[in-house]
Amino acid sequence: MNCTEEFIAKMKQKDIVINFVQAWRNDTLEESYARLDKPTRLHAYSVSKSVTSIGVGLAVQEGLLRLDDPVLRFYPEYDPAELAPNLRRMTVRDLLKMGCGSKDKMFFWNDAQRLQCRDWQDYFLRNAFPYEPGTRFEYNNFNSYMCSCIVERAAGCTLKDYMTPRFFDKLGIGNPDWLTCPMGHSAGANGLFLSIDEMS
């Protein structure tokens, strides 16, 4: 029994369903397991956050934004005087570091208002932000969602469309599936669907 088979057997004992496993060493696929057809795309959940961060890096490389840009630079339609003081100090870097200064890690995503709110950016920008940005690590989806929206505002197209020729096409990932918010912006924090081969 190889390591992958041993791992799958242990997961089955715990009633944990594993769809795919690939073990690579020195660019060689050593072991694999597939419960489904390999081309099947599955929700990559928070792997999406890493891809969004790459999108921010590409935008920085192309001079569309800087990590120390204030978030509000990309929202000129908002009057800073009407927003939380900590939001006025928040930067793109703070979002990437999961340090927006929100009240808790499940900010918005477990909130009943999410079910009725269409404009997630507006919801974020009108939050109280009790903590100074960059001083607390609070893992939440909104940091990455806002990074996605900032790249969109800087590039003039959705994060998915921005990354397709610069990232997905170069990796052979054709027509990637990425869920959007009610306003049509790439979710950023999650919602990216990839096959095991596309992820590896």
Please place each PLM-identified region on the residue numbering.
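N-terminal core-entry segment
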Residues: 17, 23-25, 30, 89, ...
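Active-site SXXK
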Residues: 43-68, 95, 147-151, 199
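Short alpha-helical patches at coil-to-helix transitions and adjacent helical residues
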Residues: 47-53, 89, 139-144, 192, ...
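A short, well-structured edge-of-sheet supersecondary motif
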Residues: 3-37
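Extracellular/periplasmic catalytic domains that process cell-envelope and extracellular macromolecules
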Residues: 14-15, 86-89, 116
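Active-site helix/loop module of the DD-peptidase/beta-lactamase fold
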Residues: 62-100, 126, 154-194
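Short, conserved acidic/polar surface loops in the N-terminal third of protein domains
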Residues: 83-85, 106-109
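Catalytic-site signature segments of enzymes, centered on catalytic residues
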Residues: 38, 107-190
